[in-house]
Amino acid sequence: MTTVALRTALIWNDEVMDDVVIEKPTRITVGRSGKATFVVPDIGLPPDFAIVRPGNRGYLLTLGEHMRGTICIDGEERDVADFVRRRDDGDGPGGFRATPISGRDWGVINL
C-alpha cells in the first residue's frame, strides 16, 4: 500500500505562515493554545479544533458553519458554506460537518 502524504498550510494575507507535511496519521488542529498545529486567535472554534483527523480509511475533514472557501472531494468542487449547510451525509454536531478525504482531494478554507 502506498503512503500518501498530507500537506496543510496556514496562509494569512496571501503569505504562508506555516506549512506541515505528514506521512503518518496525525490530527491537524487550529486554535489558541501552543499545542495546536496552527496557532490562530480566537475565531469562535472549539479549543484545538481538529480540522483534519485520522479516520477509518484515511482522513476526516471537519468544517464549520462560519468557514468559507472551496473544497474538491472525489473530483467535485464544492462551496464550503453550501457543503456544511447540506446535511445529507457526513453530519456533525452543531454547525459542523465531517467528510472523508483522500489523496487527490484538496481545499482552500477560510476560517
Q: What spans do the regions from the language model cover?
A:
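Forkhead-associated
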Residues: A5, A9-N110
